[in-house]
């Protein structure tokens, strides 16, 4: 059975794989704002990053706490890379909307992943003084 961290990794991994597959399976994916990345490889190659990292996050969902850290690192990689590319496009003036997309990646992806990585698997309630004695 998955704990809290495992459930987060399973959801994050599934979402990342779906996002990457959306770019891979679309006949003509739109890479606007990602020119920093597409200089080095096509958008479908960068979409594979989402699929591979999503699979790693999903697979890490069933590992024990402490061993699941690589799943959280894998989950961070695609939104960090793509968010940086959108920020670059915005700062360069090529894609003004990139700043908003960067903010979205920073909060709803990276922020949530960092929060989920810090969630303890089990929380023990604090005992009242009378219960401790």
Model regions: which residues?
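Hydrophobic alpha-helical membrane segments
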Residues: 49, 69-88
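A loop-to-helix transmembrane entry motif
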Residues: 33-50
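Membrane-water interface at the C-terminal end of transmembrane alpha helices
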Residues: 106-130
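Juxtamembrane helix-break-helix junctions at the cytosolic face
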Residues: 55-69
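Cytosolic juxtamembrane helix and N-cap/initiation of the first transmembrane helix
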Residues: 1-16
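Alpha-helical transmembrane segments of multi-pass membrane proteins
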Residues: 16-27
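Membrane-helix boundary connector in multi-pass membrane proteins
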Residues: 65, 80-102
């Amino acid at each position: 059975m998955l704990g809290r961290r495992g459930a987060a990794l399973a959801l994050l991994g599934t979402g990342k794989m779906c996002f990457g597959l959306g770019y891979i399976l679309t006949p003509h994916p739109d890479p606007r704002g990602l020119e920093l990345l597409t200089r080095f490889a096509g958008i479908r190659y960068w979409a594979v990053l989402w699929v591979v990292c999503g699979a790693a996050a999903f697979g890490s969902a069933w590992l024990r706490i402490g061993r699941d850290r690589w799943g959280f690192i894998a989950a961070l990689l695609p939104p960090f890379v793509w968010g940086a590319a959108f920020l670059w496009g915005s700062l360069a003036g090529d894609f003004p909307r990139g700043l908003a997309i960067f903010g979205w990646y920073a909060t709803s992806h990276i922020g949530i992943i960092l929060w989920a990585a810090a969630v303890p698997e089990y929380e023990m309630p604090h005992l009242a003084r009378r219960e401790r004695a």
